[in-house]
Amino acid sequence: MASYNPGMRPTPASPASAAGSPASLSPISALSPLDGRYAGRLGSLRPLMSELGYMHRRVQVEIAWFIALSDAGFTEFKPLSPGARTYLLGLVKNFSEEDGEAIKAIEKTTNHDVKAVEYWIKSKFEARPELERAAEFVHFACTSEDINNTSHALQLKGAREQVVLPSLDAVIDKLREMAQAFADVPMLSRTHGQTASPTTVGKEMANVVVRLQTARERIAAVRLMGKMNGAVGNYNAHLSAWPEFDWEAFSRHVVETPEPLGLGLTFQPYSIQIEPHDYMAELFDAVARTNTILIDLSRDIWGYVSLGYFKQKLKPGE
């Protein structure tokens, strides 16, 4: 038997390596179908769940913490002027892709993504004496996870409120419309694949509407948690700086105060360095159960098509 000789079958160079540079990101060069084949359907999530969206939320958390510290009563950090507050909130509101690129450039030196955000914010204080004097209060007493866990929660909050629930509502509304339109259209039911008692097309759609409404309520009801209690969850650095201050109440205030001055999340009072993320498991499970309902619907529709109940609408070019 002839032995295999790797040298007999050289690996062909990829177009990218042949050209001497990486291929630019496009739907056909993306590693994931999320940014490839299905990019057009997920565009609304990109500003929320991308690294740019993550940076944006980190800036939001750092600014909210910084502004709150100015009102805490520190001798070294007087309350900020209305103009300074407006400027800081503008950094969040007007955060751009160019700002994200600037943070990535800083990260090349720091080799630390959260520290890069901190330095970028401080760079925006230049030529503003009021803010320059207080620059060292940016990220004061925080551990990186204080910024990260709250940023993740804000990302999920945005995705749920701006994309997931509106998309689910659109499906529910369409199915409800079909349930009403076809309420009197008879359809032969089946059990165990065999013909059974009659029903209506509208009733079958209504079944799914009720299931999806319940699933939607579960998704919407999940409390998105955030903690800001330091490196091991005990406010160690905070208490070293100001032992008499009620840091737990302060942290709760920042986490639960509505946006833009706070984060509009539910305060997590007990944790280690990381927020335990049980709420994420609850949220993702609720989404998964919703997807199961949609899979059931898709399979039922497939069955109805195979039985000749439904027929695909032809579109030019398809």
Q: Which residues make up each language-model segment?
A:
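Short intrinsically disordered, low-complexity coil segments enriched in acidic
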Residues: M1-S3, G73, L265, P269, ...
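A helix-coil-helix interface module used to build multimeric assemblies
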Residues: A2-H238, W242-E256
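Conserved helix-loop functional segments at active or binding sites
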Residues: A181-V185, R218, M225, P260-P269, ...
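Glycine-rich anion/phosphate-binding loop at the beta-strand->alpha-helix junction
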Residues: A215, I272-E318
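Active-site-adjacent "gating/activation" loops or surface patches in catalytic cores
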Residues: W247-H277
